[in-house]
């Protein structure tokens, strides 16, 4: 990717020449600023983690939530402008959750002529068969979904699975691991799966959840709720979200500082004895 292309410059062209998804987007100064900020965040992550190789094919996971819609829209925005020379295939895995509106995502993708694959796999029955109703389904559900997405990526000849985790997801995961797992770990912008044949990419790791929420509302995406199964995300993650939002409220800018810290790690100044052979 050319690093000397300025997001501000190509957005000065206006909205007449843009991906069809943006044809009815707001033309306000506020939305322009939001869109440019998110695109800068995305390009920075793509550059920082060397995500891009020309001619690749990416499988973009689409759950129907605000973040996955935003991820797809911003990737298509860059691709439309010639700044993302990869083939994009959107993919939704219908996991058999009761009440899941099967028509929403296919209708949305077809309306914009976005290449896609919709697959049904009843992982919901597997999860409910293994866990009690009082337990949180999210972790097992996520692992089963990831396995199917890896398989689909291979079947479709994709080099990478692209996920919509943003800055706040990264920080919440870091503090969950710190407080409850006793380890320093978060969500990387780029990793290789255990089999070594697929990359997992997170181009939104620098994007704020607040910005993604505003973007989703402005674009009027047909959001599908994530709690159709009746399970709520764990109390631990919710507690981390509340803590981080409180810190940000009292000391604005701390979330960005924390993300910078995760990009500036000094292992020799930590206490992992495996790092010391002298």
From Swiss-Prot:
Cross-referenced Pfam families: ATP_bind_3 (PF01171)
Q: Biological process GO terms, please?
A: tRNA thio-modification
Family from the record: Belongs to the TtcA family.
**Per its record, what are the GO molecular function terms?**
4 iron, 4 sulfur cluster binding; ATP binding; magnesium ion binding; sulfurtransferase activity; tRNA binding
Q: Which NCBIfam families match?
A: PRK10696.1
Additional comments on file?
Answer: The thiolation reaction likely consists of two steps: a first activation step by ATP to form an adenylated intermediate of the target base of tRNA, and a second nucleophilic substitution step of the sulfur (S) atom supplied by the hydrosulfide attached to the Fe-S cluster.
Cross-referenced CDD domains:
TtcA-like
| UniProt-listed Enzyme Commission number(s) | 2.8.1.-
Q: What is this protein called?
A: tRNA-cytidine(32) 2-sulfurtransferase
Q: What does this protein do?
A: Catalyzes the ATP-dependent 2-thiolation of cytidine in position 32 of tRNA, to form 2-thiocytidine (s(2)C32). The sulfur atoms are provided by the cysteine/cysteine desulfurase (IscS) system.
Q: What GO cellular component is one of the record's annotations?
A: cytoplasm
Top-rank taxon: Bacteria
Q: Which InterPro entries match?
A: Rossmann-like_a/b/a_fold (IPR014729), TilS/TtcA_N (IPR011063), tRNA_Cyd_32_2_STrfase (IPR012089), tRNA_thiolation_TtcA_Ctu1 (IPR035107)
Quaternary arrangement and interactors, per the entry?
A: Homodimer.
Q: Where does [4Fe-4S] cluster bind?
A: 138, 141, 229
Taking the first listed entry, what is the main subcellular location of this protein, grouped into a coarse class?
cytoplasm
Query: Annotated motif PP-loop motif: location in the chain?
Result: 63-68
Gene this chain is encoded by: ttcA
């Amino acid at each position: 990717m050319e690093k000397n292309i300025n997001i501000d410059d190509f957005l000065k062209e206006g909205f007449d020449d843009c991906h069809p998804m943006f044809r009815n987007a707001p033309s306000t100064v506020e939305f322009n600023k939001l869109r440019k900020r998110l695109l800068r965040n995305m390009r920075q992550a793509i550059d920082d983690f060397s995500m891009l190789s020309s001619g690749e094919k990416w499988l973009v996971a689409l759950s129907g939530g605000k973040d996955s819609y935003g991820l797809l829209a911003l990737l298509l925005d860059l691709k439309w402008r010639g700044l993302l020379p990869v083939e994009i295939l959107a993919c939704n895995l219908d996991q058999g959750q009761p009440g899941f509106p099967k028509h929403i995502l296919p209708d949305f993708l077809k309306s914009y002529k976005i290449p896609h694959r919709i697959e049904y796999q009843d992982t919901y029955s597997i999860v409910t068969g293994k866990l009690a109703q009082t337990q949180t389904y999210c972790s097992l559900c996520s692992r089963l979904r990831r396995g199917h997405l890896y398989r689909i990526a291979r079947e479709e000849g994709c080099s990478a699975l692209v996920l919509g985790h943003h800055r706040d997801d990264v920080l919440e995961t870091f503090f969950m691991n710190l407080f409850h797992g006793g380890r320093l770990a978060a969500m990387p912008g780029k990793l290789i799966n255990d089999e070594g044949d697929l990359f997992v990419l997170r181009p939104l790791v620098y994007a704020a959840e607040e910005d993604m929420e505003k973007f989703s509302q402005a674009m009027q995406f047909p959001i599908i709720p994530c709690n159709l199964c009746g399970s709520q995300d764990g109390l631990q993650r919710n507690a981390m979200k509340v803590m981080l939002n409180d810190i940000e409220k009292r000391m604005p800018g701390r979330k960005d500082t924390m993300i910078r810290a995760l990009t500036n790690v000094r292992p020799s100044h930590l206490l992992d004895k495996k790092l010391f052979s002298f």
